[in-house]
From Swiss-Prot:
It is found in: Cell membrane. Essential subunit of the Sec protein translocation channel SecYEG. Clamps together the 2 halves of SecY. May contact the channel plug during translocation. This is Protein translocase subunit SecE. One of its GO terms (cellular component) is plasma membrane. Component of the Sec protein translocase complex. Heterotrimer consisting of SecY (alpha), SecG (beta) and SecE (gamma) subunits. The heterotrimers can form oligomers, although 1 heterotrimer is thought to be able to translocate proteins. Interacts with the ribosome. May interact with SecDF, and other proteins may be involved. Coiled coil: none annotated. Its main location: membrane. The chain crosses the membrane at residues 38-58. The keyword rRNA-binding does not apply. It is a single-pass membrane protein. Keywords: Cell membrane, Membrane, Protein transport, Translocation, Transmembrane, Transmembrane helix, Transport. Belongs to the SecE/SEC61-gamma family. The gene is secE.
Amino acid sequence: MNLLERIKKLPEDWKRIITVAKKPDKDTFSMYLKVTLIVMAFVGLLAYLIQLVLAFII
């Protein structure tokens, strides 16, 4: 499949994805939000701790 055929097929693929996808309910959305925020906070804390350790080493 060449590039032009793939580009022509994109709207059809997007339409299929949108028809299959469904909007999450409030509980599912809040769970995803909490998990995302916890992971972001963890990664930020980890990055800060690494930066702090490296600042004292160097």
